[in-house]
Amino acid sequence: MQILTCDGQNEGMMRQMAQLLVDAFREHWPEAWRTLEEGMEEVREMLEAERICRVALDEDGSLLGMIGGIPQYDGNVWELHPLAVQPHVHGRGIGRMLVLDFETQVRQRGGLTITLGTDD
């Protein structure tokens, strides 16, 4: 597995990310991203220049999970949003590795704090 920055150059990867949002949240928060288009809208927002957008890929380049971050307070604080892992690979530590990588990305950008909102 490798974790990389998603730059939005691969339309197929963006569609995989959008579908992951729909699939990963369907059971516990079905109103989050109900359609592929709603997922694509979120992915486009994740790819804005000031944000963090990282993907975990398997050896074949298929999407296993993703994590995003939104800078706040001049980049001193980062909101972790969203985090999603393919349901069929839950329990393998992919989410944990994405969060550890996210912490490194925030630190490299001078961030001091990471928040996780629950108001959505």
Residue ranges with predicted function:
Residues 1-3:
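Extreme N-terminal starter segment of soluble prokaryotic enzymes
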Residues 106-120:
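Conserved GNAT acetyl-CoA-binding A-motif
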Residues 83-90, 119-120:
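A short, internal acetyl-CoA/4′-phosphopantetheine-binding micro-motif in the GNAT/acyltransferase core
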Residues 96:
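Residues forming the Rossmann-fold NAD(P)(H) cofactor-binding site
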Residues 93:
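Glycine-rich phosphate-binding loop
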Residues 5-77, 81, 86, 99-101, ...:
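Acetyl-CoA-dependent GNAT
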